[in-house]
Amino acid sequence: AGAYRVLVHADAQDNDHFRLGISNTGTKYTGQVRSSLTYVNNNISGMADTLGVSVITSPGHFSDVKTGAVAYRKLLPEMGGELSVQASYGKVNIDDMQPYPGLLDMDLSGKSLALDLHYRQFLTYTSRTKNILDFGIGYRKMRSDYGFSFSGTPINYRNDYRVILASIDFSHRERKE
């Protein structure tokens, strides 16, 4: 009397996920089509860590569009937090862009590198309330080259910078019922 018997059944799920995407988010100069391949494993070492890798390009303009990213997250239950690392790279070339042929001709290119390291401390982490303190450090390296020809007169410009970022962030989320 007053007793319950509960049977729980769990199915093993595949931790590997692949996705191939095709979209029309490009331009006429770098190809209208973008293709992406993404891989995510949400339990790579058997300890609920996550690895994600993604690459994007333009099939007809592979030499013009190359981007990629990798991310890894490691739960640290003994510390009540997690550590994450992200890296991304991008390279785009737009040659012979002629919005007004003979009057304005352009060649544009850019490269970017981003690296990030974050530690998140879970101050409160329940199904209803999440309070998280995030400490991060990042590095950015960007380079853009602009080549213009205005009525046959060449004008070249380069924008090149590197920056180190540091951040502290507090986030609070509360689920409403």
Residue ranges and their predicted role:
Residues 1-84, 125:
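Outer-membrane beta-barrel initiation region
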Residues 17, 82-177:
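Transmembrane beta-strand segments of outer-membrane beta-barrel domains in Gram-negative
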